[in-house]
Amino acid sequence: MAGESTNSVGNDITSLIQPGLDQVIQDEGVQVTLINSILGWCRIHIINPVKSSKIVKSRAFQITMIVLGIILLIAGLALTFVLQGQLGNNAFLFLIPAVIGLVKLLATSVFMEKPCTPEKWRLCKRLLQQLKIF
């Protein structure tokens, strides 16, 4: 019985907060602040520890990652055009690694070095909308 009353209170609070959240999340300033918070957490807990590891700092690892990325990009593009007749509409699936790589490059070059600004966020949103991701 007590669990049901707690649930109804939680539902009441959620229904009370939801309209305000929908309105606030549309504000670009709030979006940028949220993105900066998430990127800051990722930078501190994921990126910095990985960057400081010995294997990632090694020249061999860096060269291997660059070569692997180039091979995946070229292979994805080549397979898209070569196998398009056989695969039909599914040929675009070979572009997924290329798109992921481009989004990664965009995110790291635009956001990771400095905080996100509203202008950068508008640019990223526009690019993601053109890719039909966001």
Swiss-Prot record:
The keyword NADP does not apply. It is a multi-pass membrane protein. One of its GO terms (cellular component) is outer membrane. The chain crosses the membrane at residues 63-83, 92-112. It comes from the Bacteria. It is found in: Membrane. The keyword Zinc-finger does not apply. InterPro entries: CRPA (IPR008436). Keywords: Membrane, Transmembrane, Transmembrane helix. This is Sulfur-rich protein. It comes from Chlamydia abortus.
